[in-house]
């Protein structure tokens, strides 16, 4: 898949970042970045690793290998305020900026090569405009990063026989640091191009907590100063078809490895049935369980552990980008382990360690007849009992039996004869009554 990225100057604001740097940040195979600045009297030192290309390649576990062609900068015909000033709480004409940018690069770009499915429409165009953006501190005349459709705005743009319709855009500079922005906003907006909706409350008037820093579709693009967005969650990968969660039904002692490394997650359905189709789920209500650790793209998450998400899919909400606009029925809802749902950004909107298990709690009994108990974490692996689990360790050894020796699955004799003192795993226990396999 191939996409076009256009760098845009205004008549009064021009790019200060080299095109080569923007190209490396979006497409580089070994991109790194280090910088520091003072904020509220304190020095902030930022280190980041990974380009936008690397982010999508990693988040898709190699299923998605995008090619971003970076063109420009080109200069549109008006100043920034012409396109970005607020009119009835909306930017005046960002779509005009996008159309002009496409027309300006038409002589050097063959738009046909960006219609990957040959449906007559360019699959996506992304514009990075010079200067600041309104979402991260720019004034009211700057443009708010967003994705939209030219045709929806009444704009027709046909180049090389292809319509340019779906687009996204974001700003060059971060007003807080006076350095160029990281990949966070680009990855967020480009995720819309891929079909994913926002998971924050999109009216701008909500005061309740959504999924926050745990997701690229909410506050996550700002993790590590916008340089290290969180990896796609289990739900986001499931929606894209990049992950197939395992439906768990029977009582089980669950061992769940870290999401990025294992590409594995679990799904609970109240009916114990599910079609396992992420973008057309049936039943529409289900739960996803994933192991999030502060490694790789998740290094700057608020915590680590078992993440439990309740999904209540509604086609209209997904299509209208209003997934979490109802606090009473959010479409993708983080189940906070500690039961604390902050009411505003001032007390934990972005997320906290207690959102996940076992930091916030060691059990969740909120799904009728589908208990999650004895949640623990060891060496980055999550363990818990589902629906009561199955008898393990000393529960499987009768009290009248005496343990003679314990071997691991490789046949290596263990020094201990106390099962509970051993790490989680599978063992063969030799007792005075015989031998048996034990799951610890």
Q: Which residues does each predicted region cover?
A:
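C-terminal outer-membrane/trafficking sorting elements
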Residues: 391-440
